Amino acid sequence: MIIPVRCFTCGKVIGNKWDAYLDLLQLDYTEGDALDALNLVRYCCRRMLMTHVDLIEKLLNYNTLEKSDNS
């Protein structure tokens, strides 16, 4: 879905780091090196970025307001 704005455990703002994290991964940084470059040292904040699954683009393909032809 959408990256949470704050870490669930400690409350640190992490939502603004998602795009930078993806950019660093595109530059062939490892996950750990990218998180270190973003100054995310707490393991709770690190897991928020590492385990996030970005599904928003896939969900936007489904329009729940459209009626199907089968009804």
Curated annotation (Swiss-Prot):
Q: Does the keyword Transcription apply?
A: yes
Q: What is one Pfam family matched by this protein? A: RNA_pol_N
- Cellular compartments annotated: Nucleus
What GO molecular function terms would the record report?
DNA binding; DNA-directed RNA polymerase activity; zinc ion binding
Q: What Gene Ontology cellular-component terms does the record carry?
A: RNA polymerase II, core complex
Asked whether the UniProt record includes Secreted among its keywords, one would answer: no
Q: Which InterPro entries match?
A: RNA_pol_su_RPB10, RNA_pol_suN_Zn-BS, RPABC5/Rpb10
Q: Where does Zn(2+) bind?
A: C7, C10, C44, C45
* Swiss-Prot/TrEMBL GO biological process terms: DNA-templated transcription
Q: Write out the entry's keywords from A to Z.
A: DNA-directed RNA polymerase, Metal-binding, Nucleus, Transcription, Zinc
Q: What does this protein do?
A: DNA-dependent RNA polymerase catalyzes the transcription of DNA into RNA using the four ribonucleoside triphosphates as substrates. Common component of RNA polymerases I, II and III which synthesize ribosomal RNA precursors, mRNA precursors and many functional non-coding RNAs, and a small RNAs, such as 5S rRNA and tRNAs, respectively. Pol II is the central component of the basal RNA polymerase II transcription machinery. Pols are composed of mobile elements that move relative to each other. In Pol II, RBP10 is part of the core element with the central large cleft.
Q: Which family does it belong to?
A: Belongs to the archaeal Rpo10/eukaryotic RPB10 RNA polymerase subunit family.
- State the oligomer form and interacting partners: Component of the RNA polymerase I (Pol I), RNA polymerase II (Pol II) and RNA polymerase III (Pol III) complexes consisting of at least 13, 12 and 17 subunits, respectively.
Name of the molecule in the record: DNA-directed RNA polymerases I, II, and III subunit RPABC5
Organism name? Brassica napus (Rape)
The root-end lineage is: Eukaryota, Viridiplantae, Streptophyta, Embryophyta, Tracheophyta
